[in-house]
Amino acid sequence: MFALTAAAAALASPFAHVQTTQSQLALCNPCVQLGGQGLNYLVNEILNAGVIGGCGKLCHGLKAGVERTGCDILCGAVGIEAFVKALNKTDLDPIYFCEEVHACPAGRDDAAGSVDGNAVSPATGPAGTTFAMQVDFSVINATGVGEIRIAVKGPGPSVGQSFLNTGFTPGHYATNVTLATKDDPSAQPPVQWLPGTYEYEFEVCQGECGSKHPHSKVFGSTKGTFQIA
C-alpha cells in the first residue's frame, strides 16, 4: 500500500548516508528484516518449544523469505545462546534487538535533528489516486539506525508503515512516500477509501519511534492532510 521513493537529497536506498563501514553493517540489514512480528514468533516458539534443535529449528517456523533468511544468518553468526538472551530482553523492538546482538551499531547518544515540514501531491483526488507525501528533515549531528514512520487516518482505513535506515550524515533531506488509495473488496476486512479528509503524520527517529530503550530518539513529527473527493 505504501512505497518509499527517493527525492532530491533523500534516501537513495535504505542504506544511503550510513555512518558506519560496510563490514559493520553486514548483519544489520538481515537482522532488522526480522521485524516485530518475526521477533514475536521467535519469543513464543522459545516459550512453547525451547531451543532444542538450535538455530535451524527455531528459524524454520518463520515464513520463507527475508524473515527466515535474516534469522538463519543472524542466529548462526551470534550463536543460539546470545540470540535467545537478546530476544528475552528487548521487548520486540527490532532495532534495539539488533544493537544488543551487535548486528547493528548502537545509535549515537549525541545524535540530533529536526523535522522541517511536509507536502502532499495531489492535495485532492478521487479514490484510486496515488498520493505522494514528502517529509523534509535536517540532521545536525550524525544519526544511527532508525526509521521514518508514517500513519494515515480518516473516514476510510487507518494505515501506517515504518521505513528503516542506517543513519544520516549532517545535512538536509527530503523523502517521499506514496500511498495508493485503491479499494480492495476482497481484503479481510474490505478496504474502501471513502470520501473525506485524511490526516497523515510523519515521525523521524533514531531507533524505533516511541521506544524507551537506550539510544532511541524522536527527532520530530509533522502532519498534513489530503482529500478524497
Predicted regions and their residues:
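Short beta-strand elements
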Residues: Q206-A229
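Beta-strand-rich binding/interaction modules
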Residues: T143-K153
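Surface-exposed loop/edge segments in extracytoplasmic proteins
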Residues: G156-L164
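Contiguous beta-strand segments within globular domains
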Residues: V120-G144
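A glycine-anchored, Pro-Gly-centered beta-turn/N-cap motif
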Residues: T129, G144-G146, T166-C205, H213-H215
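Long, contiguous interaction/targeting segments characteristic
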Residues: F15-D110
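Short, compositionally biased P/S/T/A/G/V-rich stretches that sit at domain boundaries
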Residues: A103-P126
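Fungal secretory targeting signals
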Residues: M1-A16
